[in-house]
């Protein structure tokens, strides 16, 4: 029994861990060289426009809201909500102008999400 205990202690000291199970070999990771830094373009359009509309209220007499400056689909601008709410908003805003197949796929997704939200989740 003492032989087993001695082997166990040496194995623990060798790997410097106190696990009761083996995770494979205990070879340490060696870094032979410092990784090279990535070349990052700091003046891409996205990075250069970051924070442009932060002071729109202070500098512009609070006439424009930052959500009015956002470029994108009408039903997404300044909107926070889940996928079902976003799709319902899209259907209400542009549903009558959608192509037949797109509207059909949208309606299928909405009905699927209705079923999912009504069967699962916190608020049932």
Curated annotation (Swiss-Prot):
Transmembrane segments: none annotated. Residues 1-31 form a transit peptide. GO terms for cellular component: mitochondrial large ribosomal subunit. Keywords: Mitochondrion, Ribonucleoprotein, Ribosomal protein, Transit peptide. GO terms for biological process: translation. The keyword Ribosomal protein applies. It is found in: Mitochondrion. GO terms for molecular function: structural constituent of ribosome. InterPro entries: Ribosomal_mL51. It comes from the Eukaryota. Component of the mitochondrial ribosome large subunit (39S) which comprises a 16S rRNA and about 50 distinct proteins. Belongs to the mitochondrion-specific ribosomal protein mL51 family. This is Large ribosomal subunit protein mL51. It comes from Danio rerio (Zebrafish). The lineage of its organism: Eukaryota, Metazoa, Chordata, Craniata, Vertebrata.
